[in-house]
């Protein structure tokens, strides 16, 4: 749709350049966007991050960190606990510490712009042991952490790891915390910015926020006024038979062409 909208201006003089960027690995590491930041380009005043927002301009979203907590114990026959060190026993304590940490984060941090107005910490997936009559020698827990704009991701990650280490102390097991991929930082831009206001007027939708992560932070780092906007719904994302409502296609093209005309034409 962006290409279709831009084609309208192929033979027209533009006072400001129009750039369409396609990035790699947007679903996980954001490697393409990180490379753009490292290379310092493209240079632009405004950026629209194409995401399924139902044509609603998004001025803020939460950060996303996915982490793995691993506990190494020692396996042995379950008939004699002294023969091993149970990794699941330690992980039980760690999970309790994470749940307490989640509550502390929610009590300290709120953002009125979000439907879920606190940071979230989800204990999403655990793998441990291999047999009920064997002391569990290894346990792995994967978690999803979503922080609000303004929160220091590095500081929270350090606090989380320290809570886990404290919970595991004295258990004769080894604990590590690692990231599945580099964290996606939170993003926030002025809700009354020029681009946000124009997209809001053209789409007849009030600016809002979302809890999923995007590349917006990285483009903003390059000095662009950045908005997340696009056709479709996140409800259909990551589902079998993803689809885009036909009713969104032409309005999206029309809106993009008006935005290009406003900011790029002489």
Where are these regions (language model features)?
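Residues within well-formed alpha-helices
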Residues: 1-4, 43, 90, 251
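Metal-dependent amide/peptide-bond hydrolase catalytic core
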Residues: 66-266
